[in-house]
Regions:
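Extracytoplasmic electron-transfer domains, predominantly the class I c-type cytochrome c fold
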Residues: 44, 62-128
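Electrostatic cytochrome c docking/interface patches
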Residues: 20-47
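Sec-dependent N-terminal signal peptides
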Residues: 6-12
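C-terminal motif of bacterial Sec signal peptides marking the signal peptidase cleavage site
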Residues: 15-18
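Cys/His-rich metal-chelating microdomains
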Residues: 22, 57-60
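The −1 position to Zn-ligating cysteines in a subset of zinc-ribbon hairpins
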Residues: 50
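Short, cysteine/histidine-rich loop/knuckle motifs that typically chelate Zn2+
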Residues: 53
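Positively charged n-region of N-terminal signal peptides that target proteins for export
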Residues: 1-4
Length: 128
């Protein structure tokens, strides 16, 4: 019984840290980087466009995808999809038109608007 309770507690603790909201400082930095992207809206838009189906993304319930890469720490990576230098404009381009960048990518064109790509990029840049 103790083992079961311990495991349950450990699981709940890990889930609460995965759902932490970005700090105000992180949100402000992400908005500056992306030219006005709204990180909080981006967190919602990730689910709207189904990004959580393929990717594991902190703070997004159910985002435990096994197809695309884990998106935590994307702001610290040198390249996006192994093709583009990691800049806010390139991340927004990738989010909107992945097949224009890499024609053989598994990532589909989802019809993401420019503003939504800005918001999603802002959220992704808050992830550690």
């Amino acid at each position: 019984m103790r083992t079961t309770l311990f495991l349950l507690f450990a699981f709940l603790l890990s889930m609460s840290s995965a759902c932490e909201r970005p700090s105000r400082t992180e949100v402000a930095r992400a908005a500056t980087l992306t030219g006005g992207g709204n990180a909080r809206a981006g967190q919602t838009e990730i689910r709207k466009y189904g990004c959580n189906t393929c990717h594991e993304i902190s703070g997004v319930p159910g985002a435990r995808g096994l197809i695309g890469p884990r998106l935590d720490g994307i702001g610290e990576r040198y390249y996006i999809a192994g093709e583009l230098t990691n800049t806010p404009n390139n991340l927004m381009l990738w989010i909107q038109h992945p097949r224009q960048v890499e024609s053989h990518t598994a990532m589909p064109e989802m019809g993401v608007t420019e503003q939504d790509s800005r918001d999603i990029a802002a959220y992704l840049y808050t992830l550690r």
